[in-house]
Every structure is written in C-alpha cells, then in structure tokens.
C-alpha cells in the first residue's frame, strides 16, 4: 500500500481585519473548488473555529456501488463494494494511505458529505435511483485539501496551514499573498420565476396521512416525511449563502464548491461528533415557530415543553440516539435534555447524548452505525426508511444526510444536512420535513415544513438586495 506523508507548515496572522467570508471571496477564484465552514454557536466563541479548504489533492467517493479514490500523484482507483469490502473498509483503506505530522496535524483529514441515499450501503433500503442527469453527484464524497485557513474567533487570529510533502517546495506564501490582498469582488444574485415543489400541499398532506396510518397500524412509531422545493436563479449563489448565514446563524455554516455543483447551508444539528474518543449526538425533536417577540416566544416555548406529543417524540428519538451510540460506545448517557434553542424562524428542543468509544471501536463504523439520524428518518429506523423510500416521490440526495470533517486521527464532526441548498445549473433544491406520529395533524405538519423553510425563503429575498 502506497503512503503519502506530509508535515504541516504554517503561518499565523492577525485575524482582526479578516473575516471567513471576505477571505473566501479573495481566494475562491485563485483556488477553484474551495470550501468554507463556519460556526456561529451561541454557547460562546471560545470553541469557534472557521475553516477554508483550498486546492483538492485527493478524494474518496462512492456512487452506484463503485468506490473511486484519487490520490495526490494523480493515480485513480475504482473498486466495487462487496460484502467483504464495505464502505467503512474502503474509507479506512483510503485514509491509511495518508500520514500527517506537525503542529496542526489534528486538522489533517477530509471534508465532504454523505447523502441520505448512502443508506443503501448500510441497510436493506430500496433507495430510488435518479434518472435526472442533473443529479449525478456522488452519494458519498470527501476531499483532502492541500491548504487550510483556520480562523480562531476567540484569539482573533488566523493560521495558514499547508500539507508539505517530503522534498516538496512550499507555496504557503502564495496563499498568504491572496489572503492579504485587499481587493475582492462580489456578484449579484436574483431568483427567476416562482418557487415550485415536487409535491403540492395536498399531495404532501396525503403523504402525511399515509405516515399517520402506518403509525396507527404499528409499522413505525414515527416517520419523517419531507418535500422538495426548486428555485431557478441567476448570478452568484455565494451571495445567497451570505444572506442565509446572516438570517439564520447556526452551529454549522458551510459552503462546499465541488465544481459542477455546490452544497451550502446553516444546520443547527450535530449528527455525530467524535473527539478524543468521546462520541456525541445532539437530537433535535420538537419544533415550533418563532415570533420574534420575547413574551410570545416564551409562551410558545412553554407550550412546546408541555406538549405530550412533542415530549413523547423527543424521548423516543433520544432513546434511539442512545441505542445507536451504544453499538460502539460504553458509558452512554444524556448530558442535557429538552433544552430550548432559538433560531431565526423556529424554536427547537435539543438534547445531547454522549458515550466513550469502546477500545476496539472504529470511528468510521461508529459514524455509519448512527446514520442516518433518527430525527430525519424515524423509529424503528430501518422500517421508517423503507417507508420513506416508498412514499416520497424521489430519493432525498443530500437532504437528511451529513456534511463535515473526518480526521486522520479518528476525530470527526458531522452536521445533519438540513436548512441547506443544493445548487446546480442555476437551480436550487431545498427540502424540509417533519416527524409524523399517530396523533399528528396534517395541517400542523404542513405548517411545520413551512416554518423550517422560513429562513431559506427569507434568505432568497435578502440575497437579491445584497
């Protein structure tokens, strides 16, 4: 097995005159297919880090059952998945071919996404294949970047990090020159035509009634059913990202440019985070609208906390998260329970479940065993996913999957891909859903989808004014 060894070369610069957004605007044309990850965590800025990844040098992808790996020496390998060579085996084989040492080796890893469609490789789920030529993005895609720009909000500094191979010249000065350039260009964004959906309101309500019937029959306790919206546009979708991050600051803000398509959003929910052998899941279950008025929001929060349907649903999904982690962890417990968290258009109830990885546990397998989130599928998870594939008119693509970082050291941080746009060929896809139980009301569930999409729709309007 060939290996690629790197040492992290770095430069620390004052960060008080540079924001992640302005820096990204400076470097994106010089370094195509770059990415931006930000955090806007209301718990405090001491742990906030933002990242820009530049110059893809290696990638791991899975599509239609074929694993494709591309390496820094431009070599390329393709291999089909088999019962003896599954996704976690392929991923670990890929990651083992990289060695990173140095001061910032902990940031050595791959950045990318796992679509909801990838469940076909983990469970017996008949995911609908897409016949849409515009929907040819890999089901799983993670990329290793040559350069990282790391922003430390608390210390007001940024660090330029380069993966430097043996006997390889450094080009970190070129990145520094681009960052220190005071000039950058922004471009307009304009929505064209009306927002459409692949389901009418009545068709989605019909699907909700199907979900309620399955719950009443005992097929599932809960099922998450979603609908997709489509908006044509002209101009620069990064301007839309800027609007979204302004309207809906979240723990996970991201803009991934993959060349032919982009994925960007503002997710509130941690799917799975592993750091120093500790794994956490932050299930969100229970949502109500946010009015913007302090007294009204307090009353809405109290009503949400007292709602027996929402309480039962939340408890069930916390138990599901605990069971998922227990497959590879011990000392699994709930750190906090039903904490109200406030976002631009909604109020969520959030819990945190954590556990310590077993001695022989593999982080990639631990992540896969929690995928997808119960909050985006239902319970029991496998049966819910089978029904989702049957009821929803198309596969979900990125929606409901994960996006984030997987480290060479075993750490990972994955957000659930919600409150997210997929952009391709001047067309935006965005999607939202809600958890259906036996006592659900179809009109309330329809409104919950609209509440969750409120930030995205408002961002489209704001982006046209930037």
Give the predicted meaning of each segment.
Residues 1-466:
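Extended alpha-helical targeting/anchoring segments
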């Amino acid at each position: 097995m060939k290996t690629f060894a790197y040492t992290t070369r770095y430069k620390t610069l004052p960060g008080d005159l540079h924001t992640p957004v302005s820096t990204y605007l400076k470097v994106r044309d010089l370094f195509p297919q770059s990415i931006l990850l930000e955090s806007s965590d209301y718990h405090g800025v001491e742990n906030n880090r933002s990242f820009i990844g530049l110059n893809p040098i290696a990638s791991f992808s899975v599509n239609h059952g074929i694993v494709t790996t591309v390496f820094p020496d431009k070599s390329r390998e393709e291999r089909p998945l088999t019962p003896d060579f599954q996704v976690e085996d392929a991923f670990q084989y890929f990651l083992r071919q990289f060695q990173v040492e140095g001061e910032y080796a902990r940031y050595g890893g791959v950045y990318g996404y796992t679509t909801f469609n990838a469940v076909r490789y983990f469970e017996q789920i008949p995911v609908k294949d897409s016949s849409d030529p515009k929907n040819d993005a890999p089901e799983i895609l993670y990329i290793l970047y040559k350069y990282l720009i790391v922003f430390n909000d608390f210390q007001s500094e940024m660090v330029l990090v380069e993966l430097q191979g043996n006997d390889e010249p450094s080009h970190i000065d070129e990145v520094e020159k681009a960052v220190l350039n005071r000039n950058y260009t922004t471009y307009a964004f304009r929505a064209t035509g009306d927002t459409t959906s692949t389901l009418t309101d009545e068709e989605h309500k019909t699907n909700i009634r199907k979900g309620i019937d399955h719950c009443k029959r005992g097929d599932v306790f809960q099922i998450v059913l979603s609908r997709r919206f489509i908006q044509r546009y002209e101009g620069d979708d990064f301007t839309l990202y800027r609007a979204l991050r302004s309207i809906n600051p979240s723990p996970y803000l991201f803009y991934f440019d993959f060349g032919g398509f982009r994925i960007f959003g503002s997710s509130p929910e941690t799917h799975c985070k592993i750091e120093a052998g500790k794994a956490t899941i932050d299930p969100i279950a229970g949502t109500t609208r946010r009015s913007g008025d302090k007294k009204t929001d307090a009353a809405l929060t109290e009503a949400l906390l007292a709602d027996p349907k929402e309480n039962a649903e939340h408890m069930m999904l916390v138990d599901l998260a605990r069971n998922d982690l227990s497959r590879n962890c011990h000392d699994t417990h709930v750190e906090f329970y039903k904490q109200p968290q406030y976002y631009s258009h909604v109020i969520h109830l959030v819990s945190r479940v954590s556990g310590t990885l077993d001695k022989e546990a593999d982080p990639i397998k631990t992540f896969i065993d929690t995928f997808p989130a119960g909050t985006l599928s239902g319970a029991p998870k496998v049966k819910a996913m089978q029904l989702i594939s049957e009821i929803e008119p198309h596969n979900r693509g990125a929606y409901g999957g994960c996006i984030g970082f997987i480290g060479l050291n075993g750490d990972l941080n994955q957000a659930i891909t919600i409150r997210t746009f997929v952009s391709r060929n001047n067309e935006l896809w965005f999607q939202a859903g809600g958890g259906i139980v036996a006592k659900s009301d179809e009109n309330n569930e329809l409104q919950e989808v609209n509440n969750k999409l409120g930030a995205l729709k408002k961002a489209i309007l704001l982006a046209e004014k930037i």
